[in-house]
A protein has these predicted regions:
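Glycine-centered hinge/linker elements that transmit conformational signals in sensory
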Residues: 90-91, 132-169, 200, 204-214
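Extracytoplasmic/periplasmic solute-binding protein
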Residues: 47-57, 62, 85-147, 178-187
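Single conserved hydrophobic/aromatic residue that forms the stacking wall/gate
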Residues: 1-14
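Short helix-initiation/N-cap motifs at beta->coil->alpha
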Residues: 83-85, 160-178
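Short helix-loop capping/hinge motifs at secondary-structure junctions, enriched
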Residues: 70-79, 234-241
């Protein structure tokens, strides 16, 4: 290959650079291009002053959003601050509201139980990395959260199953008019922090991100990963490869630029707004050109049409994201932690088997966390 695309864990990139398989992009692309990126984005890809990969595409993150309007409609007020709080909220919903509420637990509960387990796993891994310690899963607050999850899981899986069955049969007894929790499932191939339309911004104004820790006052971290590009040291065309990487970096989607460039705050015009505004200008010019030839009634009709068009224009956002959305995006990004370890995305068979044994009741929580710690260390 000339250019390699892979998913961070950066361990994989550093391993390949140690073997001499990757070119140092600082020498190849120039510091000015690369130093414009967020330092925390580049740090896991650096080794001994060299940079051996660059990010590509919008990050994938693990984060749920809370719909405050739905929460209040259920007579609840407390926004979860810890994973224990979140699981208590889910348990309260399943016990008190699931059978007869018009508010669904989530906008898409399918796979929610597995997503929650994954989120706990990633959050503990992120906490260890951010603290500079080896991955461990024996911390008391993580073990307590895992116990709470194991107790909650059967009811949550049952809710998922019934919700999906009733939704597919159009009965809708569990409701689909809104979600108390918006589930943002994270995929290794497609960034999924929002539904499918934005990045770290909520889909509705009354949604708030659940920035959770394992204990009160603990670190608020959003585990994050993204794809990276690297250049084969044996490439016959390193300069061409560097030019292509520079082009890809400069022409990434707006979401990706927001996530990777700290100073990228320029508002991107909304094409729909631009097109509508230009049409109004064209229509106004046409009206002024022929106004003298129109009857009073025709003039009134034309002016009413223009007035309605201007009013409609005010309903279209002038930019893809507002300045406030960009600010919120970067504020949330400050809590994001780029996962450096690669085993969690590599489909480690030992981890998968151990997880399944835990969920099937074939091993205790104590055995699980001890064995998991042994595997990852």
């Amino acid at each position: 290959y000339e250019i390699r695309l892979s998913l961070v864990g950066s361990e994989m990139c550093i391993r390949d650079s140690d073997k001499g398989d990757l070119l140092d992009l600082r020498l190849l692309m120039g510091a000015d291009t690369l130093d414009s990126l967020l330092p925390q984005v580049l740090a896991p890809l650096e080794k001994a002053g060299g940079l051996f990969a660059i990010p590509c595409g919008t990050p994938s993150v693990s984060c749920w959003f809370l719909d405050q309007s739905s929460l209040e409609s259920l007579g609840l007020t407390d926004v979860p601050a810890t994973y224990a709080d979140l699981m208590t909220l889910i348990s309260t919903y399943l016990t008190d509201f699931a059978s007869d509420s018009d508010v669904a637990l989530a906008d898409n509960p399918g796979g929610m139980a597995d997503s929650l387990f994954q989120q706990l796993f990633w959050a503990q891994l992120a906490r260890c990395e951010a603290s500079g310690v080896q991955p461990t899963f024996t911390d008391a607050d993580f073990v307590a959260a895992l116990r709470q999850y194991i107790a909650l899981r059967p009811a949550l899986v049952d809710y998922e199953t019934r919700w999906l069955a009733e939704r597919s049969s159009s009965l809708g007894d569990l409701g689909d008019t809104g979600g108390i929790v918006t589930v943002l499932s994270v995929s290794s191939s497609q960034p999924s922090l929002l539904h499918l339309n934005t990045s770290l911004t909520p889909s509705k104004t009354d949604e708030v991100p659940l920035l959770l820790s394992f204990s009160e006052g603990g670190a608020l971290l959003i585990p994050m990963t993204y794809s990276v590009l690297a250049v084969n040291r044996r490439s016959a065309y390193p300069d061409d490869a560097a030019s292509l990487l520079s082009y890809l970096l400069d022409n990434q989607p707006y979401d990706a630029k927001l996530a990777l460039l700290p100073d990228y705050a320029a508002l991107q015009p909304n094409p729909a707004y631009t097109e509508a505004a230009q049409k109004i200008l064209d229509d106004e010019a046409l009206y002024m050109q022929y106004r003298a030839t129109l009857s009073p009634l025709e003039q009134k009709q034309a002016e009413d049409i223009l007035t309605d068009a201007r009013a409609a224009l005010h309903q279209i956002p002038p930019n893809v994201y507002s300045a406030a959305e960009i600010a919120a995006y970067h504020a949330r990004l400050n809590h994001a932690h780029l996962l450096e370890s690669s085993f969690w995305v590599s489909g480690d068979q030992h981890v998968s088997t151990l997880r399944q044994r835990l969920l099937d009741g074939e091993c205790t929580v104590e055995t699980f966390v001890q064995e998991l710690t042994r595997i990852v260390q």
